[in-house]
Protein backbone atom coordinates (compact mmCIF):
# COMPACT_ATOMS: atom_id res chain seq x y z
CA UNK A 1 0.00 0.00 0.00
CA UNK A 2 1.20 3.47 -0.89
CA UNK A 3 0.08 6.62 0.90
CA UNK A 4 1.13 10.26 0.92
CA UNK A 5 2.87 11.23 4.15
CA UNK A 6 5.08 14.10 5.23
CA UNK A 7 8.83 13.88 5.67
CA UNK A 8 8.41 14.31 9.42
CA UNK A 9 6.30 11.16 9.57
CA UNK A 10 8.79 9.33 7.37
CA UNK A 11 11.60 10.47 9.68
CA UNK A 12 9.69 9.10 12.62
CA UNK A 13 8.86 5.78 10.95
CA UNK A 14 12.45 5.23 9.79
CA UNK A 15 13.77 5.80 13.30
CA UNK A 16 15.57 9.02 12.51
CA UNK A 17 14.10 10.81 15.52
CA UNK A 18 15.00 8.39 18.35
CA UNK A 19 13.24 5.30 19.68
CA UNK A 20 9.86 3.94 18.84
CA UNK A 21 6.56 5.39 19.94
CA UNK A 22 3.20 3.95 20.47
CA UNK A 23 0.38 4.63 18.04
CA UNK A 24 -2.44 6.85 19.13
CA UNK A 25 -5.00 5.13 21.28
CA UNK A 26 -8.70 5.50 21.54
CA UNK A 27 -8.30 8.50 23.80
CA UNK A 28 -6.74 10.37 20.88
CA UNK A 29 -9.97 10.22 18.98
CA UNK A 30 -11.72 13.55 19.08
CA UNK A 31 -14.41 13.63 21.73
CA UNK A 32 -17.78 15.25 21.44
CA UNK A 33 -18.17 18.81 22.57
CA UNK A 34 -19.97 17.85 25.81
CA UNK A 35 -17.17 15.53 26.90
CA UNK A 36 -14.55 18.16 26.14
CA UNK A 37 -16.37 20.63 28.34
CA UNK A 38 -16.52 18.11 31.24
CA UNK A 39 -12.79 17.32 30.95
CA UNK A 40 -12.02 21.00 30.94
CA UNK A 41 -13.98 21.52 34.12
CA UNK A 42 -12.28 18.66 35.86
CA UNK A 43 -8.87 19.98 34.90
CA UNK A 44 -9.73 23.42 36.24
CA UNK A 45 -10.76 21.79 39.49
CA UNK A 46 -7.32 20.35 40.15
CA UNK A 47 -5.21 21.85 42.87
CA UNK A 48 -2.18 23.96 42.17
CA UNK A 49 0.03 21.36 43.88
CA UNK A 50 -1.10 18.66 41.50
CA UNK A 51 -0.40 20.82 38.47
CA UNK A 52 3.05 21.76 39.77
CA UNK A 53 3.81 18.12 40.47
CA UNK A 54 2.94 17.26 36.92
CA UNK A 55 5.22 19.97 35.49
CA UNK A 56 8.23 19.27 37.79
CA UNK A 57 11.07 17.94 35.60
CA UNK A 58 12.89 16.27 38.50
CA UNK A 59 9.86 14.11 39.34
CA UNK A 60 9.14 13.22 35.73
CA UNK A 61 9.06 9.47 35.15
CA UNK A 62 11.35 7.96 32.58
CA UNK A 63 9.42 6.85 29.54
CA UNK A 64 9.17 3.11 29.27
CA UNK A 65 10.33 1.33 26.21
CA UNK A 66 8.26 -1.74 25.58
CA UNK A 67 10.22 -4.80 24.58
CA UNK A 68 9.00 -8.39 24.66
CA UNK A 69 7.37 -8.16 28.13
CA UNK A 70 3.86 -9.32 28.86
CA UNK A 71 1.16 -6.82 28.22
CA UNK A 72 -0.66 -7.65 31.50
CA UNK A 73 1.94 -8.06 34.24
CA UNK A 74 4.91 -6.40 32.62
CA UNK A 75 7.29 -9.28 33.48
CA UNK A 76 9.66 -11.00 31.12
CA UNK A 77 8.52 -13.60 28.69
CA UNK A 78 7.44 -16.83 30.36
CA UNK A 79 4.92 -15.47 32.83
CA UNK A 80 1.84 -17.38 33.92
CA UNK A 81 -0.59 -14.96 32.29
CA UNK A 82 -3.21 -16.41 30.07
CA UNK A 83 -2.35 -14.17 27.17
CA UNK A 84 1.02 -14.85 25.63
CA UNK A 85 3.31 -11.94 25.09
CA UNK A 86 3.56 -10.56 21.63
CA UNK A 87 6.03 -8.07 20.24
CA UNK A 88 4.64 -4.55 19.93
CA UNK A 89 4.45 -2.65 16.67
CA UNK A 90 7.81 -1.28 15.50
CA UNK A 91 6.85 2.32 16.20
CA UNK A 92 5.92 1.87 19.86
CA UNK A 93 8.08 3.55 22.47
CA UNK A 94 9.66 6.38 20.46
CA UNK A 95 10.68 9.41 22.45
CA UNK A 96 9.89 11.72 19.54
CA UNK A 97 6.24 10.85 19.15
CA UNK A 98 4.93 9.57 22.52
CA UNK A 99 1.60 8.11 23.32
CA UNK A 100 -1.09 10.71 23.53
CA UNK A 101 -2.52 9.08 26.63
CA UNK A 102 -2.14 11.40 29.55
CA UNK A 103 -1.11 14.35 27.39
CA UNK A 104 -3.32 17.32 27.86
CA UNK A 105 -3.57 20.51 25.86
CA UNK A 106 -0.26 21.60 24.24
CA UNK A 107 1.34 18.39 25.54
CA UNK A 108 1.39 19.57 29.15
CA UNK A 109 -0.14 16.40 30.63
CA UNK A 110 -3.61 15.10 31.30
CA UNK A 111 -5.65 14.03 34.31
CA UNK A 112 -3.64 10.91 35.14
CA UNK A 113 -1.23 11.57 38.03
CA UNK A 114 2.48 11.28 37.32
CA UNK A 115 3.82 7.79 37.99
CA UNK A 116 0.41 6.14 37.76
CA UNK A 117 0.32 2.89 35.87
CA UNK A 118 -1.26 3.26 32.47
CA UNK A 119 -3.57 0.54 31.31
CA UNK A 120 -2.30 -1.40 28.34
CA UNK A 121 -4.31 -2.79 25.51
CA UNK A 122 -3.72 -6.28 24.32
CA UNK A 123 -3.22 -6.94 20.64
CA UNK A 124 -6.53 -7.39 18.94
CA UNK A 125 -8.48 -5.66 21.69
CA UNK A 126 -9.69 -2.15 21.88
CA UNK A 127 -8.14 -0.02 24.47
CA UNK A 128 -5.26 2.29 25.17
CA UNK A 129 -2.01 1.52 23.36
CA UNK A 130 1.11 0.90 25.44
CA UNK A 131 3.54 3.74 25.83
CA UNK A 132 4.99 6.20 28.30
CA UNK A 133 2.68 8.16 30.50
CA UNK A 134 4.39 11.50 29.98
CA UNK A 135 6.94 12.92 27.53
CA UNK A 136 9.77 15.35 28.21
CA UNK A 137 8.74 18.00 25.69
CA UNK A 138 11.61 20.31 26.64
CA UNK A 139 14.14 17.62 25.77
CA UNK A 140 12.35 16.86 22.50
CA UNK A 141 12.43 20.53 21.47
CA UNK A 142 16.14 20.72 22.31
CA UNK A 143 16.87 17.63 20.23
CA UNK A 144 14.93 19.00 17.28
CA UNK A 145 16.72 22.36 17.52
CA UNK A 146 20.14 20.72 17.60
CA UNK A 147 19.58 18.42 14.64
CA UNK A 148 19.74 21.19 12.01
CA UNK A 149 17.43 23.49 10.11
CA UNK A 150 13.70 22.91 10.14
CA UNK A 151 12.54 20.04 8.02
CA UNK A 152 10.72 21.21 4.91
CA UNK A 153 7.43 19.44 4.51
CA UNK A 154 7.52 17.52 1.27
CA UNK A 155 5.46 14.65 -0.11
CA UNK A 156 6.94 11.14 -0.02
CA UNK A 157 5.69 7.70 -1.03
CA UNK A 158 5.91 4.81 1.46
CA UNK A 159 6.38 1.53 -0.43
CA UNK A 160 6.16 -2.08 0.64
CA UNK A 161 8.98 -3.05 -1.74
CA UNK A 162 12.21 -1.38 -2.70
CA UNK A 163 13.33 1.80 -0.92
CA UNK A 164 11.37 2.65 2.20
CA UNK A 165 10.37 6.08 0.92
CA UNK A 166 10.92 8.20 -2.17
CA UNK A 167 10.67 12.00 -2.18
CA UNK A 168 8.44 13.54 -4.85
CA UNK A 169 10.55 16.45 -6.13
CA UNK A 170 8.47 19.31 -7.54
CA UNK A 171 9.65 21.66 -10.27
CA UNK A 172 10.66 24.25 -7.72
CA UNK A 173 11.12 24.04 -3.96
CA UNK A 174 9.18 26.30 -1.64
CA UNK A 175 11.16 27.47 1.36
CA UNK A 176 9.71 28.34 4.72
CA UNK A 177 9.70 32.04 3.92
CA UNK A 178 7.31 31.45 1.03
CA UNK A 179 9.90 32.10 -1.70
CA UNK A 180 10.72 29.78 -4.56
CA UNK A 181 14.10 28.48 -5.48
CA UNK A 182 14.39 28.16 -9.24
CA UNK A 183 16.40 25.55 -10.97
CA UNK A 184 20.01 26.43 -11.46
CA UNK A 185 19.71 25.97 -15.20
CA UNK A 186 17.22 28.84 -15.35
CA UNK A 187 19.55 31.19 -13.50
CA UNK A 188 22.46 30.85 -15.89
CA UNK A 189 23.34 34.17 -17.51
CA UNK A 190 25.93 34.64 -20.18
CA UNK A 191 28.91 36.51 -18.88
CA UNK A 192 29.45 38.43 -22.08
CA UNK A 193 27.60 39.41 -25.22
CA UNK A 194 28.45 37.43 -28.30
CA UNK A 195 27.65 40.27 -30.72
CA UNK A 196 28.61 40.44 -34.37
CA UNK A 197 32.18 39.37 -35.05
CA UNK A 198 33.66 40.91 -38.24
CA UNK A 199 35.46 38.62 -40.63
CA UNK A 200 38.69 40.56 -40.15
CA UNK A 201 38.93 39.41 -36.51
CA UNK A 202 39.88 36.03 -35.19
CA UNK A 203 37.17 34.03 -33.53
CA UNK A 204 38.83 34.21 -30.09
CA UNK A 205 40.09 37.79 -30.31
CA UNK A 206 40.10 39.47 -26.89
CA UNK A 207 39.35 43.03 -25.87
CA UNK A 208 42.57 44.96 -25.22
CA UNK A 209 40.95 46.71 -22.25
CA UNK A 210 39.21 44.01 -20.21
CA UNK A 211 40.04 40.75 -21.98
CA UNK A 212 36.44 39.95 -22.88
CA UNK A 213 35.45 38.68 -26.32
CA UNK A 214 36.09 41.44 -28.87
CA UNK A 215 33.41 42.45 -31.35
CA UNK A 216 35.26 44.80 -33.68
CA UNK A 217 37.70 47.64 -34.26
CA UNK A 218 36.41 50.57 -32.20
CA UNK A 219 38.19 53.92 -31.87
CA UNK A 220 41.47 52.45 -33.21
CA UNK A 221 41.43 49.49 -30.82
CA UNK A 222 40.01 46.00 -30.80
CA UNK A 223 37.50 46.07 -27.97
CA UNK A 224 34.30 44.50 -26.76
CA UNK A 225 30.89 46.15 -26.92
CA UNK A 226 30.99 47.07 -23.25
CA UNK A 227 34.29 48.95 -23.36
CA UNK A 228 33.34 50.64 -26.62
CA UNK A 229 30.09 51.94 -25.15
CA UNK A 230 31.81 52.96 -21.90
CA UNK A 231 34.45 54.97 -23.76
CA UNK A 232 31.94 56.65 -26.09
CA UNK A 233 29.57 57.53 -23.26
CA UNK A 234 32.41 58.94 -21.15
CA UNK A 235 33.62 61.25 -23.93
CA UNK A 236 30.20 62.36 -25.17
CA UNK A 237 28.95 63.25 -21.69
CA UNK A 238 32.35 64.45 -20.41
CA UNK A 239 32.23 62.12 -17.41
CA UNK A 240 35.94 61.39 -16.96
CA UNK A 241 36.56 64.43 -14.68
CA UNK A 242 34.06 62.98 -12.21
CA UNK A 243 35.69 59.55 -12.01
CA UNK A 244 37.66 58.63 -8.89
CA UNK A 245 39.54 55.60 -7.59
CA UNK A 246 39.72 54.41 -3.96
CA UNK A 247 42.97 52.52 -4.56
CA UNK A 248 45.12 55.34 -5.97
CA UNK A 249 44.60 54.26 -9.59
CA UNK A 250 46.14 50.82 -9.16
CA UNK A 251 43.09 48.71 -10.02
CA UNK A 252 43.47 45.70 -12.30
CA UNK A 253 40.90 45.89 -15.10
CA UNK A 254 39.58 42.60 -16.41
CA UNK A 255 36.25 41.13 -17.39
CA UNK A 256 35.15 40.80 -13.76
CA UNK A 257 36.45 44.05 -12.27
CA UNK A 258 35.85 46.42 -15.19
CA UNK A 259 32.65 47.85 -13.66
CA UNK A 260 34.17 48.44 -10.21
CA UNK A 261 36.48 51.35 -11.02
CA UNK A 262 35.55 53.74 -13.82
CA UNK A 263 38.70 55.83 -13.52
CA UNK A 264 41.11 52.93 -13.95
CA UNK A 265 39.00 51.56 -16.79
CA UNK A 266 39.07 54.89 -18.62
CA UNK A 267 42.83 55.22 -18.05
CA UNK A 268 43.36 51.80 -19.54
CA UNK A 269 41.24 52.74 -22.56
CA UNK A 270 43.54 55.71 -23.16
CA UNK A 271 46.70 53.70 -22.51
CA UNK A 272 45.85 51.01 -25.06
CA UNK A 273 45.30 53.68 -27.75
CA UNK A 274 41.58 54.45 -27.94
CA UNK A 275 41.24 57.85 -29.66
CA UNK A 276 39.08 60.49 -28.02
CA UNK A 277 38.88 62.56 -31.21
CA UNK A 278 37.08 59.76 -33.03
CA UNK A 279 34.07 60.01 -30.74
CA UNK A 280 31.53 62.11 -32.68
CA UNK A 281 29.11 64.62 -31.23
CA UNK A 282 25.47 64.84 -32.27
CA UNK A 283 25.99 67.00 -35.38
CA UNK A 284 28.91 64.92 -36.64
CA UNK A 285 27.02 61.71 -35.99
CA UNK A 286 24.05 62.95 -38.04
CA UNK A 287 26.37 63.97 -40.87
CA UNK A 288 28.04 60.58 -40.80
CA UNK A 289 24.73 58.76 -40.98
CA UNK A 290 23.67 60.94 -43.90
CA UNK A 291 26.90 60.16 -45.72
CA UNK A 292 26.40 56.46 -45.11
CA UNK A 293 22.88 56.62 -46.55
CA UNK A 294 24.13 58.51 -49.61
CA UNK A 295 26.85 55.93 -50.21
CA UNK A 296 24.32 53.13 -49.91
CA UNK A 297 22.03 54.81 -52.42
CA UNK A 298 24.93 55.39 -54.81
CA UNK A 299 26.02 51.74 -54.58
CA UNK A 300 22.43 50.62 -55.13
CA UNK A 301 22.17 52.67 -58.33
CA UNK A 302 25.54 51.41 -59.53
CA UNK A 303 24.45 47.83 -58.98
CA UNK A 304 21.18 48.48 -60.79
CA UNK A 305 22.96 50.05 -63.75
CA UNK A 306 25.42 47.18 -63.81
CA UNK A 307 22.58 44.68 -63.87
CA UNK A 308 20.83 46.61 -66.65
CA UNK A 309 23.98 46.62 -68.74
CA UNK A 310 23.93 42.84 -68.81
CA UNK A 311 20.41 42.73 -70.24
CA UNK A 312 20.12 41.49 -73.82
CA UNK A 313 20.38 43.92 -76.72
CA UNK A 314 18.39 43.61 -79.95
CA UNK A 315 19.32 40.74 -82.21
CA UNK A 316 20.00 41.12 -85.96
CA UNK A 317 16.39 40.33 -86.84
CA UNK A 318 15.13 42.75 -84.23
CA UNK A 319 17.43 45.48 -85.51
CA UNK A 320 15.96 44.99 -88.97
CA UNK A 321 12.40 45.19 -87.59
CA UNK A 322 13.29 48.32 -85.60
CA UNK A 323 14.71 49.94 -88.72
CA UNK A 324 11.55 49.24 -90.74
CA UNK A 325 9.24 50.62 -88.04
CA UNK A 326 11.38 53.73 -87.59
CA UNK A 327 11.39 54.50 -91.30
CA UNK A 328 7.61 54.02 -91.45
CA UNK A 329 7.19 56.58 -88.71
CA UNK A 330 9.58 59.14 -90.17
CA UNK A 331 7.97 58.96 -93.61
CA UNK A 332 4.51 59.65 -92.19
CA UNK A 333 5.38 62.17 -89.49
CA UNK A 334 4.70 65.72 -90.68
CA UNK A 335 7.56 68.22 -90.33
CA UNK A 336 9.79 65.59 -88.70
CA UNK A 337 12.26 66.93 -86.17
CA UNK A 338 11.81 70.52 -87.43
CA UNK A 339 8.29 70.92 -86.13
CA UNK A 340 9.22 73.73 -83.73
CA UNK A 341 10.54 75.92 -86.54
CA UNK A 342 7.60 75.23 -88.86
CA UNK A 343 4.66 75.26 -86.47
CA UNK A 344 1.99 78.00 -86.58
CA UNK A 345 0.20 79.19 -83.47
CA UNK A 346 -3.57 79.35 -83.58
CA UNK A 347 -4.85 82.87 -83.07
CA UNK A 348 -5.50 83.57 -79.43
CA UNK A 349 -9.00 84.89 -80.05
CA UNK A 350 -10.00 81.56 -81.65
CA UNK A 351 -11.39 78.98 -79.26
CA UNK A 352 -11.73 81.30 -76.30
CA UNK A 353 -15.52 81.76 -76.39
CA UNK A 354 -17.55 78.57 -76.98
CA UNK A 355 -20.99 79.28 -78.42
CA UNK A 356 -22.63 76.29 -80.10
CA UNK A 357 -23.75 73.21 -78.17
CA UNK A 358 -22.94 69.67 -79.24
CA UNK A 359 -25.17 66.65 -78.73
CA UNK A 360 -23.53 65.75 -75.43
CA UNK A 361 -24.18 69.22 -74.02
CA UNK A 362 -20.64 70.63 -74.29
CA UNK A 363 -20.09 74.15 -75.63
CA UNK A 364 -17.98 74.34 -78.80
CA UNK A 365 -16.25 77.22 -80.52
CA UNK A 366 -17.25 76.72 -84.16
CA UNK A 367 -14.24 78.59 -85.55
CA UNK A 368 -11.80 76.44 -83.59
CA UNK A 369 -13.78 73.33 -84.46
CA UNK A 370 -13.50 74.15 -88.15
CA UNK A 371 -9.74 74.62 -87.90
CA UNK A 372 -9.29 71.28 -86.15
CA UNK A 373 -11.36 69.34 -88.66
CA UNK A 374 -9.18 70.67 -91.45
CA UNK A 375 -6.06 69.01 -90.02
CA UNK A 376 -7.81 65.81 -88.88
CA UNK A 377 -8.13 64.33 -92.37
CA UNK A 378 -4.40 64.46 -93.27
CA UNK A 379 -3.51 63.24 -89.76
CA UNK A 380 -5.67 60.11 -90.13
CA UNK A 381 -4.22 59.51 -93.59
CA UNK A 382 -0.68 59.53 -92.21
CA UNK A 383 -1.65 56.98 -89.52
CA UNK A 384 -3.05 54.66 -92.20
CA UNK A 385 0.13 55.01 -94.26
CA UNK A 386 2.24 54.18 -91.21
CA UNK A 387 0.28 50.95 -90.67
CA UNK A 388 0.57 49.93 -94.32
CA UNK A 389 4.36 50.26 -94.19
CA UNK A 390 4.59 47.61 -91.46
CA UNK A 391 5.23 44.17 -92.98
CA UNK A 392 3.17 42.22 -90.44
CA UNK A 393 0.14 44.49 -90.77
CA UNK A 394 -0.23 43.97 -94.51
CA UNK A 395 -0.42 40.19 -93.98
CA UNK A 396 -3.61 40.46 -91.90
CA UNK A 397 -7.12 40.16 -93.38
CA UNK A 398 -8.76 43.40 -94.51
CA UNK A 399 -11.44 43.14 -91.81
CA UNK A 400 -8.83 42.97 -89.08
CA UNK A 401 -6.90 45.88 -90.60
CA UNK A 402 -9.97 48.12 -90.47
CA UNK A 403 -10.74 47.16 -86.87
CA UNK A 404 -7.16 47.81 -85.78
CA UNK A 405 -7.05 51.20 -87.53
CA UNK A 406 -10.34 52.33 -86.03
CA UNK A 407 -9.14 51.36 -82.59
CA UNK A 408 -5.66 52.87 -82.69
CA UNK A 409 -6.08 55.95 -84.89
CA UNK A 410 -7.03 58.32 -82.08
CA UNK A 411 -4.37 56.82 -79.79
CA UNK A 412 -1.56 57.32 -82.30
CA UNK A 413 -2.66 60.87 -83.14
CA UNK A 414 -2.78 61.72 -79.43
CA UNK A 415 0.71 60.24 -78.97
CA UNK A 416 2.12 62.26 -81.86
CA UNK A 417 0.59 65.42 -80.42
CA UNK A 418 1.76 64.65 -76.85
CA UNK A 419 5.41 64.14 -77.81
CA UNK A 420 5.32 67.63 -79.34
CA UNK A 421 4.39 69.37 -76.13
CA UNK A 422 6.30 72.60 -75.55
CA UNK A 423 6.60 73.41 -71.81
CA UNK A 424 7.76 76.97 -72.54
CA UNK A 425 4.66 78.02 -74.47
CA UNK A 426 2.44 75.31 -72.92
CA UNK A 427 1.13 74.26 -76.34
CA UNK A 428 0.63 71.07 -78.32
CA UNK A 429 1.48 70.93 -82.02
CA UNK A 430 -1.26 69.11 -83.92
CA UNK A 431 -0.31 67.31 -87.11
CA UNK A 432 3.09 68.97 -86.95
CA UNK A 433 1.83 72.38 -88.00
CA UNK A 434 -0.75 73.91 -85.61
CA UNK A 435 0.22 74.86 -82.04
CA UNK A 436 -2.79 75.15 -79.72
CA UNK A 437 -3.29 75.85 -76.04
CA UNK A 438 -5.31 73.86 -73.56
CA UNK A 439 -8.48 76.00 -73.65
CA UNK A 440 -8.45 76.23 -77.46
CA UNK A 441 -8.25 72.45 -77.79
CA UNK A 442 -10.92 71.99 -75.15
CA UNK A 443 -13.37 74.45 -76.74
CA UNK A 444 -12.62 73.14 -80.22
CA UNK A 445 -14.58 69.93 -79.65
CA UNK A 446 -12.34 67.66 -77.54
CA UNK A 447 -13.74 68.68 -74.18
CA UNK A 448 -12.11 67.07 -71.13
CA UNK A 449 -9.97 64.85 -73.37
CA UNK A 450 -7.74 67.85 -74.00
CA UNK A 451 -6.73 67.83 -70.32
CA UNK A 452 -5.65 64.19 -70.57
CA UNK A 453 -3.59 64.87 -73.71
CA UNK A 454 -1.84 67.87 -72.17
CA UNK A 455 -1.08 65.89 -68.97
CA UNK A 456 0.32 63.07 -71.09
CA UNK A 457 2.49 65.55 -72.98
CA UNK A 458 3.94 66.91 -69.73
CA UNK A 459 4.84 63.44 -68.48
CA UNK A 460 6.30 62.28 -71.81
CA UNK A 461 8.51 65.36 -72.02
CA UNK A 462 10.56 63.94 -69.15
CA UNK A 463 11.18 60.70 -71.09
CA UNK A 464 12.85 62.51 -74.00
CA UNK A 465 11.75 59.90 -76.53
CA UNK A 466 13.50 59.60 -79.87
CA UNK A 467 11.87 58.69 -83.21
CA UNK A 468 12.56 54.96 -82.83
CA UNK A 469 10.93 54.78 -79.41
CA UNK A 470 7.86 56.69 -80.63
CA UNK A 471 7.64 54.44 -83.71
CA UNK A 472 7.83 51.22 -81.66
CA UNK A 473 5.24 52.55 -79.22
CA UNK A 474 2.90 53.26 -82.15
CA UNK A 475 3.41 49.72 -83.47
CA UNK A 476 2.52 48.26 -80.06
CA UNK A 477 -0.67 50.37 -79.98
CA UNK A 478 -1.58 49.28 -83.51
CA UNK A 479 -1.16 45.54 -82.89
CA UNK A 480 -3.60 45.27 -79.97
CA UNK A 481 -5.19 41.84 -79.96
CA UNK A 482 -8.01 42.85 -77.58
CA UNK A 483 -9.94 44.87 -80.16
CA UNK A 484 -13.53 43.78 -80.57
CA UNK A 485 -14.37 41.73 -83.71
CA UNK A 486 -10.87 40.53 -84.68
CA UNK A 487 -10.53 37.29 -86.61
CA UNK A 488 -6.81 36.43 -86.40
CA UNK A 489 -6.35 37.15 -82.71
CA UNK A 490 -3.43 34.75 -82.21
CA UNK A 491 -1.53 36.11 -85.19
CA UNK A 492 -2.02 39.71 -84.04
CA UNK A 493 -0.94 38.82 -80.51
CA UNK A 494 2.21 37.19 -81.86
CA UNK A 495 2.98 40.33 -83.87
CA UNK A 496 2.55 42.53 -80.81
CA UNK A 497 4.90 40.28 -78.79
CA UNK A 498 7.60 40.62 -81.43
CA UNK A 499 7.27 44.42 -81.33
CA UNK A 500 7.33 44.44 -77.52
CA UNK A 501 10.44 42.25 -77.36
CA UNK A 502 12.30 44.40 -79.88
CA UNK A 503 11.14 47.52 -78.03
CA UNK A 504 12.39 46.20 -74.68
CA UNK A 505 15.80 45.22 -76.07
CA UNK A 506 16.14 48.61 -77.70
CA UNK A 507 15.40 50.33 -74.37
CA UNK A 508 18.04 48.14 -72.70
CA UNK A 509 20.50 49.21 -75.37
CA UNK A 510 19.79 52.96 -75.29
CA UNK A 511 18.41 53.74 -71.81
CA UNK A 512 20.15 51.14 -69.65
CA UNK A 513 21.34 53.79 -67.20
CA UNK A 514 17.78 54.96 -66.37
CA UNK A 515 16.13 52.78 -63.72
CA UNK A 516 12.69 51.35 -64.56
CA UNK A 517 12.47 53.26 -67.84
CA UNK A 518 10.85 50.39 -69.70
CA UNK A 519 8.16 49.71 -67.10
CA UNK A 520 7.30 53.39 -66.73
CA UNK A 521 6.99 53.80 -70.49
CA UNK A 522 4.62 50.84 -70.76
CA UNK A 523 2.32 52.51 -68.24
CA UNK A 524 1.74 55.27 -70.78
CA UNK A 525 0.12 52.71 -73.08
CA UNK A 526 -2.79 52.46 -70.65
CA UNK A 527 -3.17 56.24 -70.64
CA UNK A 528 -3.27 56.31 -74.42
CA UNK A 529 -5.86 53.51 -74.53
CA UNK A 530 -8.09 55.51 -72.19
CA UNK A 531 -7.75 58.64 -74.32
CA UNK A 532 -8.53 56.68 -77.48
CA UNK A 533 -11.70 55.17 -76.01
CA UNK A 534 -13.07 58.60 -75.13
CA UNK A 535 -11.82 60.12 -78.38
CA UNK A 536 -13.98 57.80 -80.45
CA UNK A 537 -17.20 59.18 -79.00
CA UNK A 538 -16.00 62.75 -79.55
CA UNK A 539 -15.32 62.12 -83.25
CA UNK A 540 -18.75 60.62 -83.68
CA UNK A 541 -20.15 63.96 -82.51
CA UNK A 542 -17.83 65.74 -84.92
CA UNK A 543 -19.20 63.60 -87.77
CA UNK A 544 -22.77 64.52 -86.84
CA UNK A 545 -22.04 68.25 -86.61
CA UNK A 546 -19.84 68.48 -89.73
CA UNK A 547 -20.72 65.57 -92.01
CA UNK A 548 -18.91 67.04 -95.01
CA UNK A 549 -15.56 67.36 -93.25
CA UNK A 550 -14.91 63.61 -92.69
CA UNK A 551 -15.59 60.76 -95.09
CA UNK A 552 -17.12 57.52 -93.76
CA UNK A 553 -13.89 55.62 -94.46
CA UNK A 554 -11.87 58.08 -92.39
CA UNK A 555 -14.31 57.89 -89.47
From Swiss-Prot:
Q: Where is this motif: PPXY motif?
A: 88-91
Q: Where is the composition biased (Basic and acidic residues)?
A: 28-57
Any one biological process term the GO annotation gives: thyroid hormone receptor signaling pathway
Looking at the keywords, is Metal-binding present? Answer: yes
Further details from the record: THRA, the cellular counterpart of v-ErbA, is a thyroid hormone receptor alpha.
Q: Which family does it belong to?
A: Belongs to the nuclear hormone receptor family. NR1 subfamily.
Could you identify this protein by its name? Answer: Gag polyprotein
Gene encoding this polypeptide?
Answer: gag
